[in-house]
């Protein structure tokens, strides 16, 4: 549920058209053909998605691939993709790799960005069959987020509970439909909030914006926790 809202953020903040990278079984072989070792599955899938986009687009375009200041593998994906693009002579494709740790200080409208993550997390707390109906048309304001959190929090939980953790690409795309199948079978899936992870990341990086968001996030949490567990 994050994609639509993050695209809306990018289009509003940079006044540019956005498209979603294709990541599936057809793009994976393209990425694997360019790798020589046992990389984590998300990297060849992501690389294949970029190469597929390069085949479909004849003109120049940019690919947004966030990086990190740490040494973890997924924070280094942009540099690997850039190397392959250079080797194939695809200089018209530019990789934009902002550091996650400094996003609130360096990106335009950080409040809008944070709300884009929050609404995705809230929708994941709703029953899967109600998510489309509950999804706001655009990135909601704080008052709308509070209303949405209270509404979702009032929905009685049903089904057996299962917590799922993992790398984001695997959780939301490269999973062969397993989470969807589990939800159809009545399992209630719980995921760690992406917005919470980013809030702690930004707080530890010294972001001043996190102090402004703390109270608002607490209100959302109380609204959400109104739902009996």
Predicted regions and their residues:
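An N-terminal assembly and electron-transfer interface module characteristic of large anaerobic redox
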Residues: 1-229
């Amino acid at each position: 549920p994050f994609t639509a809202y993050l695209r809306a953020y990018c289009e509003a903040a940079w006044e540019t058209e956005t498209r979603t990278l294709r990541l599936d079984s057809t793009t994976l072989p393209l990425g694997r053909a360019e790798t020589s070792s046992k990389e984590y599955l998300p990297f060849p899938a992501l690389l294949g998605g970029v190469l597929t986009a390069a085949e479909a687009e004849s003109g120049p375009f940019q690919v947004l691939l966030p990086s990190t200041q740490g040494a973890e593998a997924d924070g280094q994906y942009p540099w690997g993709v850039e190397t392959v693009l250079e080797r194939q002579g695809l200089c018209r494709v530019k990789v934009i790799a902002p550091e996650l740790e400094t996003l609130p200080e360096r990106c335009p409208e950080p409040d809008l960005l944070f709300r884009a993550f929050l609404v995705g997390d809230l929708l994941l707390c709703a029953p899967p069959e109600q998510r489309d109906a509950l999804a706001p048309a655009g990135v909601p304001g704080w008052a709308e987020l509070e209303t949405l959190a209270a509404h979702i929090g009032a929905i009685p939980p049903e089904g057996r509970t299962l917590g799922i953790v993992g790398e984001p690409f695997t959780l939301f795309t490269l999973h062969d439909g397993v989470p969807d199948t589990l939800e159809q079978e009545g399992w209630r899936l719980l995921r760690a909030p992406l917005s919470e992870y980013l809030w702690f990341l930004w707080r530890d990086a010294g972001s001043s914006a996190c102090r402004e968001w703390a109270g608002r996030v607490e209100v959302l949490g109380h609204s959400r926790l109104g739902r009996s567990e």
